Design a protein with these regions (language model features):
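Cell-envelope and extracellular/periplasmic
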Residues: 26-480
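Bacterial Sec-dependent N-terminal signal peptides
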Residues: 1-27
């Protein structure tokens, strides 16, 4: 055997020895979500889980608990145990000990944990909005002062998978101008608003991908169980680099999170499903129901953002998708932030004002989830209509005082008779109702408000929150 052959044999033996050592002394391993700086949901029975050798005993000790928890890894090497968390507070530590290895997790806070998902408007970071030099410098000052030291950020690395994953890539970060700069702007403004109002730690898990449709974030099995949604199962984008196939982001970027106890979720998506407006309520019901089932913590809050005005190439598609999103409010424990007034540039599908978006989402959470009296949490919502001779009376909820209409309102309200021809309408305010009419329509049957792709708000409640676009008819609308 020559010198080169002897060297190769030695290398092989060393590699084999290392592999053998790792196999017989496999260290306890934790998922990415369980690590330094994490926020755990307060007053909850939370999961702590990971991997180890089959049959290996794992001990979990948390500094807020007087007793440890013990669990034995399954034959597949999985382990999971449940521990209880106290009221919000910290910092705490946690130690996970296996046969030959121990992991200490530090700087743990206990508070409120929220999942933040969707497509590009959730995925848009403060850096993507121009960075601190050009966007909300007053917020930068708050961060630099340390106002949000109890907020923690976790970004799920973008990935796709044809099969459900058990782990993702990412880590919990403390707040500074750098970490916030690279975080979802909508998620940040939502979480920082909660932090200010609740005065307790907040953990934000940001998992989003621009240009994606809702079916990509939904388990395929759930779509298969819904006969009306079969269209989405077989849809494929045709691009390996862009996730357009049903379930691939649920598998890689949602399912790995489902062991981690959350309080609820916020969602900013819809643009990529605008031509699916007829099926969108059923699709979102399936997505929300499947997520709630996967987490197994009941019907957790799910608050979402209605898409803003934009000059889509398909006529009325944006208005029809907004209508579909309104219908999603029939899903239990949901709420919707309206953005008809913050579009700015109708040629930009990404409104720059993410501050108000985050705050409006937080108003829903503070009111409905945390029981705080924040005043108004929603703009006017269309409730019912009544034909009264030559006019139509429109009734609203969430008016919070008298309705308000801007001077451009007459251009946003339209009224039609049985011929289905709409004309600009005159509008009068009567408390929580509007009376809509037109001299050109003697026998009105239907009213529409802001029902165009690019319509902006002209109707607000007493506190200045905008109403969603709506219509009283269900006539077929052309999108070509």
């Amino acid at each position: 055997m020559n010198k080169i052959q002897k060297t190769l044999v030695l290398v092989v033996l060393v590699i084999a020895g290392i592999f053998s050592f790792n196999q017989t002394n496999a260290a306890v391993r934790l998922p990415a979500l369980i690590g330094n700086n994490m926020v755990l949901q307060q007053n909850a029975a939370i999961n702590v889980w990971g991997w180890a050798d089959a049959g290996e005993k794992v001990i979990v000790q948390a500094s807020w608990l007087s007793a440890s928890a013990e669990v034995v890894a399954t034959k597949e090497g999985n382990w999971k145990t449940i521990i209880n968390t106290p009221n919000a507070g910290g910092p705490y530590t946690m130690t996970i000990t296996g046969r030959d290895y121990s992991i200490k997790i530090e700087n743990i806070l206990i508070g409120e944990v929220w999942l933040c998902s969707g497509q590009s408007n959730m995925d848009l970071t403060i850096k993507g909005l121009g960075g601190w030099g050009n966007y909300k410098p007053e917020v930068r000052d708050e961060v630099q002062r340390g106002d949000f030291a109890s907020v923690r950020l976790f970004t799920v690395q973008k990935d796709t998978s044809a099969y459900v994953r058990t782990d993702c890539k990412g880590n919990w970060l403390t707040v500074d101008t750098g970490t916030v700069d690279n975080f979802s702007a909508t998620a940040w403004f939502y979480g920082s608003s909660l932090s200010k109002k609740l005065g307790i730690p907040v953990g934000l898990i940001y998992t989003a991908w621009g240009g994606t449709a809702a079916e990509v974030w939904t388990p395929v099995a759930s779509l298969e169980a819904a006969p009306e949604l079969q269209h989405f199962i077989h849809h494929y984008s045709g691009y390996a680099w862009w996730p357009g196939t049903a379930g691939v982001l649920y598998n890689a970027m949602i399912h790995p999170l489902t062991n981690y106890t959350i309080k609820g979720a916020i969602w900013y998506q819809g643009e990529s499903n605008r031509m699916d407006y007829k099926l969108y309520p059923a699709l979102m019901n399936t997505l929300i129901t499947s997520w709630r089932k996967a987490w197994g913590i009941g019907d957790f809050p799910f608050y979402f953002v209605q898409i803003a005005p934009y000059l889509y190439k398909e006529r009325n598609s944006g208005a029809l998708l907004r209508e579909a999103q309104m219908k999603c409010l029939s899903i239990p424990n949901t709420g919707m932030a309206v953005t008809l007034d913050i579009a700015g540039d109708i040629n930009d599908i990404h409104p720059k004002n993410k501050l108000d978006v985050g705050i409006r989402l937080s108003l829903w959470a503070l009111t409905k989830t945390y029981g705080q009296d924040v005043g108004s949490f929603s703009g006017p919502v269309y409730k019912d209509f009544k034909v009264e001779k030559k006019s139509i009376s429109i009734e609203f909820i969430y008016t919070d005082g008298e309705l308000k209409i801007t001077e451009t309102a007459k251009n946003n309200f339209a009224i039609a008779g049985a011929d289905k021809v709409f004309y600009p309408a005159t509008v009068k305010i009567q408390g929580n109702k509007l009376v809509v009419s037109s001299k050109k329509v003697k026998h009105p049957v239907a009213v529409r408000y802001a029902f165009l792709n690019t319509s902006v708000s002209s109707l607000f409640n007493g506190t200045g929150l905008p109403a969603s676009s709506f219509r009283t008819d269900d006539w077929e609308i052309d999108t070509k």
